């Protein structure tokens, strides 16, 4: 712990934000730190040379990156502050979800943590769609009121298309262009669609976007939401434990990474470094 900082002491447990904006560029000054021109986000391949990751035994960080964990918050829960922050920023981009009907397509770790955040934010109804029964089971534990396996029932979302659509807000978290296209048919006029998981070029029915005045928005990373995520974890507002499918000792790290790559078995795999929670 450096001499020039205050508020932290040796032995305290913290969750570390990977977001490191410069604070001096035009976007930082405009309150858009996630779009910082000099961002040093851990593990980012966007700039060249690439930014180093943080998977190491010893890591020197800025004090602003450290967020204290409450005694009741486990290290495993603290490790999920980062993906939880992604969903919190997506909700901010949607402009609010209180009292609204929400569709979430894609129930991986990001999608399911997003569902937990939606429930905490007061969404009236949360409908989740995925191709995996285990992912949808996790979605129900995180707060989804209805789930649909589109592999078993490809036309399941058709029931929401009557009278120009049903949902006020949609979060597309699967990265599937087809999920985005199908979701647009379910949106009410002037609904908001936030693309969380899409990348690359896709084709969409622009006639639906125009004809129903749908607001299509992107979401990228986070910054202030990390502190909010840790606060929500510390206050037990959101239980992230259903997303932790496996805990593996660090000496079995290779097997843990292989397990994490098997989406049929794993959701979030936590490495146990043998450090006891308070």
Task: Identify the residue ranges that each predicted region occupies.
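Helix-to-beta-strand junctions that scaffold the AdoMet/dcAdoMet cofactor pocket
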Residues: 187-189
């Amino acid at each position: 712990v450096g001499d020039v900082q205050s508020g932290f002491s040796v032995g305290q447990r913290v969750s570390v934000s990977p977001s490191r904006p410069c604070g001096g560029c035009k976007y930082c000054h405009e309150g858009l730190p996630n779009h910082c021109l000099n961002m040093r986000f851990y593990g980012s391949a966007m700039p060249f040379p690439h930014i180093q990751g943080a998977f190491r035994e010893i890591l020197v960080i800025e004090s602003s990156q450290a967020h204290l964990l409450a005694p009741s918050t486990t290290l495993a829960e603290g490790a999920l502050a980062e993906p939880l922050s992604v969903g919190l920023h997506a909700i901010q981009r949607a402009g609010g979800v209180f009292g609204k009907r929400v569709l979430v397509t894609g129930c991986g770790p990001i999608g399911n943590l997003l569902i937990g955040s939606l429930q905490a934010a007061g969404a009236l109804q949360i409908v989740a769609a995925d191709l995996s029964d285990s992912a949808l089971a996790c979605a129900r534990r995180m707060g989804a009121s209805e789930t649909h396996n589109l592999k078993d029932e490809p036309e399941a979302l058709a029931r929401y298309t009557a009278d120009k659509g049903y949902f006020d807000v949609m979060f597309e978290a699967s990265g599937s262009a087809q999920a985005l296209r199908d979701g647009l048919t379910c949106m009410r006029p002037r609904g908001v669609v936030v693309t969380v998981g899409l990348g690359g070029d896709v084709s969409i029915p622009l006639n639906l976007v125009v004809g129903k005045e749908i607001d299509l928005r992107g979401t990228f990373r986070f910054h202030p939401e990390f502190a909010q995520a840790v606060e929500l974890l510390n206050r037990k507002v959101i239980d992230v434990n259903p997303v932790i499918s496996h805990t593996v000792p660090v000496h079995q790290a290779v097997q843990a990474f292989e397990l994490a790559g098997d989406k049929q078995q794993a959701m979030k795999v936590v490495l146990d470094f043998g450090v006891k929670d308070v």
